[in-house]
Swiss-Prot record:
Top-level taxon of origin: Eukaryota
Family: Belongs to the tubulin family.
Species per Swiss-Prot/TrEMBL record: Encephalitozoon cuniculi (strain GB-M1)
Gene: TUB4
Function: Tubulin is the major constituent of microtubules. The gamma chain is found at microtubule organizing centers (MTOC) such as the spindle poles or the centrosome, suggesting that it is involved in the minus-end nucleation of microtubule assembly.
CDD domains: gamma_tubulin
Gene Ontology CC: cytoplasm; gamma-tubulin complex; microtubule; spindle pole body
Binding site for GTP: 135-141
Subcellular location field: Cytoplasm, Cytoskeleton, Microtubule organizing center, Spindle pole body
Pfam families: Tubulin, Tubulin_C
Annotated protein name in UniProt: Tubulin gamma chain
Record's keyword terms, sorted: Cytoplasm, Cytoskeleton, GTP-binding, Microtubule, Nucleotide-binding
């Protein structure tokens, strides 16, 4: 068994996690009390994300971390109380990376002890999943500290993150979010193996377009995030012949370590109220939609110069694997995907098993995970906003009181700039020997 331990850090991370565990429970036939409701053989590996307690209740392999109780106090009872960390201060990190990181330094050993205990309960721990936002205080700051500590304590384990990026096209109530983002990106780049990127504006726009509702709520957006996370882990939880470990998925998506930013696309997305409306969709329809910018969950527009390093489509409901092969060949022949010139086209497809407890609005649904040189635009926007603040030396004092010196900002910017330039270089035929 290749187990996965999930780390939910901060308000955003715990809201993502709450919806994710609802989805996993539904797919594996487990109640939100941890009781098995579906005794059929589902062909699944429940033990990847859950363990069974002595009373046979299924308990998530998860650590919940926050500095204020509002979200974490609503966690279902089947979470182990020994795996929930809540600061005694109870006031949150005030959208300050330095505050979150400082608390992490002071209290990080308590969380590491929880992680060690969870790891010891695994037969063959493979992966840590971090769920967080990069722009606030706790998910960014405390999350950064945990990334550093996990890489020290578990250097051979995979660290994958689902990282929510800010609305870079819009003004924000959190004026220091470019600082928080760059400081977090520094730790993500140095301490993680794969960074799955979603941004708030793209999530909101896609939810609005898909559900056709006036104003999407956080519940709708978290449902979309959890749908993506469940789909991206489906071949691990319901294993087939390929891509049944995080190692195999990461080897596919991240051929070279500097290129580790992955953007998901998903179609079709519905909420429970819409699941009764059945739509017709073929394998070709779904794979074509996954290439459209509007299904992409981190907002950048592809231009001809920006190329795909690697792509993995995970499809559910496809009965004819030959249809997949024909669709891929047609896409390649028509040049519908612009791949990097320095390696053969990496257009990979995994056919997920039918999930008995999943309600789909169409026969076929699909997730695409794409590592593209377009990630440079995401990093460039954050870097540009950071430069505006840094040039004015604005708000540095509120970080300095938590021990964050100006040099740390400059180090972070340098690391982000190197990652950005690496993706620029990856567009050239001479890469990686440039």
């Amino acid at each position: 068994m290749r187990e996965v331990v999930t780390l939910q850090v901060g308000q955003c991370g715990n809201q993502m996690g709450a919806e994710f565990w609802k989805t996993l429970c539904k797919e594996h036939g487990i109640s939100m009390c941890g009781v098995l409701q579906d005794s059929r053989d589902l062909g699944d590996r429940k033990d990847v994300f859950f363990y069974q307690a002595d009373d046979n209740v299924f308990v998530p392999r998860a650590i919940l971390v926050d500095l204020e109780p509002r979200v974490i106090s609503q966690a279902p009872s089947f979470f182990s109380q020994e795996s929930i960390f809540l600061s005694n201060e109870g006031g949150g990190a005030g959208n300050n990376w330095g505050h979150g990181y400082c608390v992490g330094k002071a209290m990080g050993n308590d969380v590491i002890d929880m992680i060690q205990r969870e790891a010891e309960g695994c037969d063959a721990l493979e992966t840590f999943l971090l769920l967080h936002s990069i722009a606030g205080g706790t998910g960014s700051g405390f999350g950064s500290l945990l990334l550093e500590r996990i890489k020290e304590e578990f250097p051979k384990k995979i660290v994958q993150t689902y990282s929510i990026f800010p609305n870079n096209d819009e003004s924000s109530d959190v004026v220091v979010q470019p600082y928080n983002s760059v400081l977090t990106l520094h730790r993500l780049i140095e301490n993680s193996d794969c960074i799955v990127v979603m941004d708030n504006s793209s999530l909101g726009r896609y939810t609005l377009d898909s559900l056709r509702i006036g104003t999407p709520t956080f519940d709708h957006i978290n449902l979309l995030i959890s749908t993506v996370m469940a789909a991206s882990t489906s071949t691990i939880r319901f294993p087939g012949y390929m891509y049944c470990t995080h190692q195999s998925i990461n080897n596919c998506l991240v051929p070279l370590d500097p290129l580790k930013f992955v953007v998901p696309s998903y179609t079709p997305f519905v909420c429970d109220e819409m699941s009764r409306v059945v739509r017709k969709a073929t394998c070709s329809d779904v794979m074509r939609r996954l290439l459209l910018p509007k299904t992409r969950l981190a907002g950048y527009e592809q231009t001809k110069a920006q190329s795909v390093v690697s792509m993995l489509n995970i499809l559910h409901g496809v009965e004819d694997s030959g249809e997949v092969s024909r669709t891929v060949m047609r896409f390649l022949d028509k040049g519908m995907v612009n791949f990097v010139p320095w390696m053969p086209p990496s257009f990979n497809v995994a056919l997920g098993k039918c999930i008995a407890n999943e309600t789909r609005p169409s026969r076929v649904s699909g997730l695409s995970l794409t590592n593209s040189t377009g990630a440079s635009l995401i990093l460039s926007k954050i870097s540009g906003q950071f430069d505006k603040l840094r040039k004015q030396r604005a708000f540095l004092d509120i970080y300095k009181r938590f021990g964050v010196e100006p040099e740390m900002f400059d180090e972070g910017k340098e690391i982000v700039q190197k990652a950005l330039e690496e993706y620029h270089s990856a567009e050239m035929a001479a890469y990686p020997n440039h």
